[in-house]
Amino acid sequence: MNDVELVVLADEFGKPSGTAVKSEVHTTDTPLHFAFSCYVRNNKGDLLITRRALSKKTWPGVWTNSACGHLMPGETPEQAVARRVPHEIGISQDKLVNIACVLPDFSYRAVDSRGIVEWEICPVFTAAVTDDALLPEAEEVDSLVWVEPSKLIHAVHSAPFAFSPWMVEQLQHEALRTALTTS
């Protein structure tokens, strides 16, 4: 069995153009590739935010949205969310429900303090969990906390440097803020 994880590369028109090994793709010259971001809420309406593991290649130890990931070859963004989010936050797949795409055309490019680039076509999703007892994957998540969405939005606006650049940019979109603050 081949355990090499691939990411799907994109051309300048946003179409798949090949694959690259995930562990090798994030450099100072990262090619455009497909990913997703997801914001997860519990039954109280609180939002899960996670602190990226210190071992992450990009933005280690930074607070960010609930989960992010890359599409595998042949996979839709929705399928990637259903596969990857439960793995990262530590729940069974059947406990992740109500997956909805809020920002289908979101993309961004950001450079971290070491010059490593993230450049992604990254649809943004919301989802809910039916059980908020989580066991996060240590290679992905250092810690996590449930917060009121309005408090998170205020914190990101007040101190954007404390959060991932993609989350800061995503929360500038009214459609996402509305989806996170309404039931």
Curated annotation (Swiss-Prot):
Name of the top EC class for this enzyme: isomerase
Pathway info: Isoprenoid biosynthesis; dimethylallyl diphosphate biosynthesis; dimethylallyl diphosphate from isopentenyl diphosphate: step 1/1
Source species taxonomy: Bacteria, Bacillati, Actinomycetota, Actinomycetes, Mycobacteriales
GO molecular function terms listed in the Swiss-Prot or TrEMBL record: isopentenyl-diphosphate delta-isomerase activity; metal ion binding
Similarity comment text for this entry: Belongs to the IPP isomerase type 1 family.
Protein name as catalogued: Isopentenyl-diphosphate Delta-isomerase
Localisation: Cytoplasm
GO BP of this protein: dimethylallyl diphosphate biosynthetic process; isoprenoid biosynthetic process
Catalytic activity: isopentenyl diphosphate = dimethylallyl diphosphate
EC number: 5.3.3.2
UniProt keywords, alphabetically: Cytoplasm, Isomerase, Isoprene biosynthesis, Magnesium, Manganese, Metal-binding
Name of one Pfam family that matches: NUDIX
Active site: 68, 120
Top-level lineage group: Bacteria
Cofactor: how and how many bound: Binds 1 Mg(2+) ion per subunit. The magnesium ion binds only when substrate is bound. Binds 1 Mn(2+) ion per subunit.
